[in-house]
């Protein structure tokens, strides 16, 4: 029971810290903004689909449901999540350090090309390990990707060449060189004249057949790699000194230099780690599906017209997710629904691309919400404009209570260390003190808000112009605010009864005045 009680208090404390702690404000706003805009993009996409002749309104919902009726679609969906996640992680890691790695596509292609060339041309045909071939593939592709990433890093760090320019140039160089090597050395003897691809990778080296037990489970292996990479990056950036130094470098180069950090070192290392993630991405893209080939279908086959779009998808997702690994996984999942679910739902490629573009555009303009402040509009709607000051005071009081609790727990811990006392497990004393302060703060806020609302409308009853067009709307809003405030008082008590009576008499007086009009 003590353990459960402690966990309950701990959960409530963490929840309050998220809602009221000042240092969580930016995180709260970014989550509100991203969530609001994703919902808005769903609404706009729904009406867009409904407006297209011949497409039913239920088609939008089928994007998220119909793909689960087919095993192949489910596998493609899981694999697509892994691809988007790894691409976004590769971009976002560099972005956290203040460098814009636009070369994910080229680094991925370089890693894939190096891995295929080594396995198909350098390794003897008799070398087909019973176990561990996939690890060799991953290591080879990481080596190829990291090499290219280090070239971009060296140009940026040592020669002051803009990383965007050098990465874009290298993207094209790598795609064209890869096409030449594939066409010259590892192209199948008999092939479709309209398509351009390499020889299949042997099963012993492909993620598609990871083991005898996991044959054709490349989608699962891909998902495990992506989730493991996201967890690793999250832990590295949040809980390690190295991660904090990387973030510090991204936040302020001059500040990091003043603190004694080698900015060049951390920028270079960020490219290296991004290259490792690009190598993992290459393994998933080119060896985790049943083709197991280095294909050029997404860049124009024989007439190469572009670089792989995978890296640019990762840039969009990384920016939408604000470079957070957890949010990258969530956004990748949402985008994958549209990418994979559009075809089973009956949407053509153009409509699917339009829906995807709308979702990405809306989610990417989250900064607009900082000025619109939808969360503030909801507060105004529920407790009225005149209670904004009371709400701000309540937030400040809650933040002070949280800070006091954190500081008291820290002092208790230091005192135990100093006095060499035994650790008291599941001690809830400080949490209980905090809950009492919280209840007192809530009660004060509720009473102040109720009285402010009553006083305002009593004054409105005397001076307001009921002929004003917006008066009826204001009165309806007032009724909503009454219900919202009365929900604060749990169970029947004298305060709630008195408040209900005051609201009822005020409503009656306002209604009579409206009838007199």
From Swiss-Prot:
It is found in: Cell membrane. CDD domains: TM_PBP1_transp_TpRbsC_like. GO terms for molecular function: transmembrane transporter activity. The chain crosses the membrane at residues 35-55, 81-101, 102-122, 135-155, 164-184, 223-243, 268-288, 302-322, 328-348, 352-372. Its main location: membrane. Keywords: Cell membrane, Membrane, Transmembrane, Transmembrane helix. GO terms for cellular component: plasma membrane. Pfam families: BPD_transp_2. It is a multi-pass membrane protein. This is Uncharacterized protein MG120 homolog.
């Amino acid at each position: 029971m003590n353990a459960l009680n402690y966990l309950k208090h701990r959960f409530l404390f963490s929840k309050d810290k998220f809602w009221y702690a000042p240092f969580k404000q930016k995180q709260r706003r970014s989550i509100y903004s991203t969530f609001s805009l994703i919902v808005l993009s769903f609404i706009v996409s729904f009406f867009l689909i409904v407006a297209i002749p011949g497409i039913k309104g239920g088609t939008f919902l089928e994007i998220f449901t119909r793909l689960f009726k087919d095993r192949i679609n489910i596998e493609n969906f899981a694999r697509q999540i892994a691809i988007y996640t790894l691409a976004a992680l590769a971009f976002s890691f560099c972005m956290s350090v203040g460098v814009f790695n636009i070369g994910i596509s080229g680094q991925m292609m370089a890693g894939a090309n190096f891995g295929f060339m080594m396995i198909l041309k350098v390794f003897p045909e008799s070398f087909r390990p019973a176990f561990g071939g996939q690890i060799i593939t991953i290591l080879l592709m990481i080596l190829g990707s990291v090499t290219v990433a280090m070239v971009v890093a060296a140009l940026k760090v040592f020669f002051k060449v803009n990383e965007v320019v050098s990465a874009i140039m290298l993207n094209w160089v790598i795609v064209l060189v890869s096409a030449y090597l594939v066409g010259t050395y590892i192209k199948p003897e008999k092939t479709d004249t309209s398509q351009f691809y390499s020889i299949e990778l042997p099963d012993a080296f492909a993620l598609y057949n990871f083991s005898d037990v996991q044959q054709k489970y490349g989608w699962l292996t891909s998902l495990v790699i992506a989730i493991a990479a996201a967890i690793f990056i999250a832990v590295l950036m949040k809980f390690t000194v190295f991660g904090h130094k990387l973030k510090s470098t991204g936040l302020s180069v001059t500040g990091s230099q003043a603190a004694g950090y080698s900015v060049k070192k951390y920028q270079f290392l960020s490219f290296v780690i991004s290259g490792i993630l690009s190598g993992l991405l290459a393994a998933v893209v080119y060896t985790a599906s049943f083709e197991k080939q280095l294909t050029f279908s997404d860049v124009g086959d024989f007439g190469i017209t572009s670089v792989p779009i995978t890296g640019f998808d990762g840039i969009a997702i990384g920016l939408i997710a604000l470079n957070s690994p957890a949010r990258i996984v969530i956004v990748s999942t949402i985008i994958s629904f549209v990418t994979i679910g559009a075809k089973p739902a009956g949407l053509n490629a153009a409509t699917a691309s339009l829906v995807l573009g709308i979702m990405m555009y809306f989610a990417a303009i989250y900064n607009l919400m900082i000025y619109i402040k939808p969360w503030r509009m909801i507060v105004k709607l529920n407790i009225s404009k005149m209670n904004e000051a009371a709400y701000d005071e309540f937030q400040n009081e809650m933040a002070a209570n949280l800070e006091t609790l954190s500081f008291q727990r820290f002092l208790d811990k230091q005192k135990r260390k100093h006095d060499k006392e035994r650790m008291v497990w599941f001690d809830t004393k400080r949490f209980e003190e905090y809950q009492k302060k919280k209840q007192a703060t809530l009660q004060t806020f509720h009473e102040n808000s109720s009285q402010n609302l009553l006083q305002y409308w009593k004054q409105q009853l005397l001076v307001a112009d009921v002929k004003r067009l917006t008066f009826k709307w204001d009165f309806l809003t007032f009724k909503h605010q009454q219900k919202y405030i009365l929900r604060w008082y749990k169970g029947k008590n004298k305060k709630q009864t008195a408040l209900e009576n005051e609201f009822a008499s005020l409503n009656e007086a306002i209604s009579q005045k409206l009838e007199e009009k």
